[in-house]
Every structure is written in C-alpha cells, then in structure tokens.
UniProtKB/Swiss-Prot annotation:
Major place of residence: virion
RNA-binding is among the record's keywords: yes
Any single biological process term in GO: symbiont entry into host cell
PTM notes: Late in virus-infected cells, may be cleaved from a 56-kDa protein to a 53-kDa protein by a cellular caspase. This cleavage might be a marker for the onset of apoptosis in infected cells or have a specific function in virus host interaction.
GO molecular function per UniProt: RNA binding; structural molecule activity
Species of the source: Influenza A virus (strain A/Duck/Ukraine/2/1960 H11N8)
Bilayer-crossing regions: none
Region named Disordered: 1-21
Protein name as it appears in the record: Nucleoprotein
Positions of short motif Bipartite nuclear localization signal: 198-216
InterPro entries found in the cross-reference section: Flu_NP
One Pfam family this sequence matches: Flu_NP
One GO CC term, this protein: ribonucleoprotein complex
Amino acid sequence: MASQGTKRSYEQMETGGDRQNATEIRASVGRMVSGIGRFYIQMCTELKLSDYEGRLIQNSITIERMVLSAFDERRNKYLEEHPSAGKDPKKTGGPIYRRRDGKWMRELILYDKEEIRRIWRQANNGEDATAGLTHLMIWHSNLNDATYQRTRALVRTGMDPRMCSLMQGSTLPRRSGAAGAAVKGVGTMVMELIRMIKRGINDRNFWRGENGRRTRIAYERMCNILKGKFQTAAQRAMMDQVRESRNPGNAEIEDLIFLARSALILRGSVAHKSCLPACVYGLAVASGYDFEREGYSLVGIDPFRLLQNSQVFSLIRPNENPAHKSQLVWMACHSAAFEDLRVSSFIRGTRVVPRGQLSTRGVQIASNENMETMDSSTLELRSRYWAIRTRSGGNTNQQRASAGQISVQPTFSVQRNLPFERATIMAAFTGNTEGRTSDMRTEIIRMMESARSEDVSFQGRGVFELSDEKATNPIVPSFDMSNEGSYFFGDNAEEYDN
C-alpha cells in the first residue's frame, strides 16, 4: 500500500497539506488542534461559561455544531433560498447547560453565523481552517458510530444489518473532504453508491445534461475511493466494472452488495484517528500547552496523553451508569466502535462491554428531556496503554486476506486473531456467480474460503506503556482465541436519525 508514492498520510489529508515530512505534519496537525482550542476558549468567554461548564461535553458538542453549521455553505444557501418558518438562515445556536443553585439548567442560545465565523477565523490566524472543521466532523461521526446502530439504513439499501462493522463514518457530511473519505468504512461507501444508483433508476434525468455530467464525475470519484479501500486485485477489478458501467443499475447494486459482504473477511483499509471534543483541546491550550511547537499526531501517543490529563464532565440521566457513559466517549475518542473488545479492553485497562449491555443512552440530550433530574459526573477517559492506530484492515501477509469477524474493523495496530463465523458469512454467498463479474466473484469467494480465524493479524505489533512515547518496547498481549469480540453483539441501541 505505502509504496504507491502518491498516498498522503492522514495528517496530510487532515491538514490539506501536500507531501510533508513527519515534523511538518506534526506541526500542521498541532496548528489545527490549537486553533480548535483557541476557538473553544473564546466561545466560553463569549458565553460566560464557568470552568466546570466549559468542561461539559454537551456544551462542547453544541459549540462544535454551531461552528460546523456556520460554515456549511451549501445548507446556508439552501436555507436562504427556501425560508422555513421559525428558522433564521443567518443564525445558529443550541442548548448550553449551566449550573444554577445546585441544578443543571438548559439555555437555548442563538448567534449570528457571521459572528461565529469571525471568532473561528480569528482563532485560526485569519484562515478558514477547513481541516479543523473536518476534524470536528470526524469526532461527531466517531461518537455516532459508538452510539447508534444503522440497521435501518443498511436494510433500506438492501444490505444485511450484521454488516454494521463496515459502517464507520456513515453519518459524515459529504463536505468532509479527503480526511473524511479516509475514515469511511466499505459499507458506508457502498451505501452512498447504492443510493446514487437508485436515484438514477428512478429519475431518468439524473445522469443527463450538465448536472448529470457532474453527477457522473462524483459517482466515479466515489467508486475510486472505494476501490482504494480494497486490498485484493479481484475486489478492485470488480470496482472497475462498477465504475465503468454505462448506466449503473441493479447489476451494479448486486456487485456492490457482494463486495460489501466480501469485506467482512477480505477487509478494506479504513483510517482511524483519535479526534477529541473541542473542550479537550481548549483545556490544553488554556493551560499553556503549545501544540504547534510540540507537534501533534492523531494516530500516535498524543491523544492518549492528552486524555490522561484532561477532566471532562458529562450530564447523566437518572438511570444511566457513569462508567458506561465513559466507555462510550472513550470509544468515540479513539474511533474504536468497530474494534475487537478484547483489544480495546486491554488498552483501556478496564473491561469494555458490548453495547447491548450498556446502561446509557447517547451523549446529547433532547430538548424535551427533563433537566430537573439531571446529574453530572466525570468521564473516565484515561487508558492503561497506548497503541498506534491502523489504516489497514488487518489482513495477514498483504495480498492474501485473513480471517475477519462479522463485526470488526481494527482500530489499533495490535497483534490478535480475528475471530469470525465463516459459516455465517459464507452462507451469504450461495449461488450467484454468473454474469460479467463471475471470474472475480469466484476468485473472491475462493480467497474467503481459505481464510482461517486462527491466523494472526498485525504480527508482532503490541501496545506501549504511556511512558514509552517513542514506541520502543511493544507489549504483545495474548488473547483468548475463542472469545467473541463484537461491540454490536446483542445490540439494542437507538437508530441514528438525522
């Protein structure tokens, strides 16, 4: 993968930079997060938030959403052209929670988008700092991935709800650029493409005229992004077929669903980045930490170290378990919603439980929830070890894909086997190997059948002590081979509704 020479690292995508050396990358990522931090501090001043209120993750999310909305040009233009009752297209806002007489109060605030844009630019040396905005989008996306299930979205596009581990980044907005594309799972890309093809089937003008030409370019670009995620020649060849199709229809949808299923074993490369809430960067900047001088990386020790020293609070509903709320946010911070629970538990140093066993709902609080009974507690976001985030699917020895699990997309580069039920997955591949992609389908099925769940992925890779910032002594954990590691097992989470 890395030998292609044209690949930019995530940090380059993240900061919109061209090829840079490691020091420059660390500096530009540092510049990006310190801009987020400075913006957050300024917003806390504007809103007169106390130190405690500024550390409340719900307030952080509201402030993040405000700046994302202020810069959402396409939506802003749409809102101005289609005025809806009670929505001022020039304003943005949300709930801010304040502590009053021992109780939490909700206050709805409203700001001019222009004013928010001014504060953001001022915090980012007068620039638009799109990279910082994308970073916030990815943090929200990672939080959604850990919190909600996408069963309905999967079923609607004709995919199997058990393919949830392929859905990383499914709630990312389209404007999230290259950094956003890098973190999208195979299932997310397939779903976007299927939606597009279905529109083309239902609307004859979709591919026609000047607009249709732009649509076609977008379609081919999405196909290429997905192709780049696959690691075997047969999967890539099938993507070429889908991309080159004269007018994409049901045959292409079939091929895409086939490819998505195959990705449960022949996993795609999906990037993982630790994107933290704005308040965490704000706290660090306020305490005098110079991100740009020190440098920062989203895939190394830095986010772990930052979380070791940050105290973040969260509102807790009456029957929620604060430890479970902490787990949810920890997973979101490290983009670990689709990681093997054995690996996450080892790194975190406390047991990470499947979502079906969590007594907690999402982090955000609906406007109709009763604030009288709300409490708050400290989120435990520290870890026992740290590990390097991966951008590969953990397939063993390059071109040959290894065992995958019906619900794992590795986040950490740590040696483990990837347990999976081959029977369950292979059952989805009965029959249909005819048509123009038959030889590729046969080849893909052959590779999947030869995969063994005893195979070890990320051979020799381990976790590191938090004192080992240069990653010199890997500690290779040994896992119980038989143990199931799926977060979505026995799931009862809410659906994601936009």
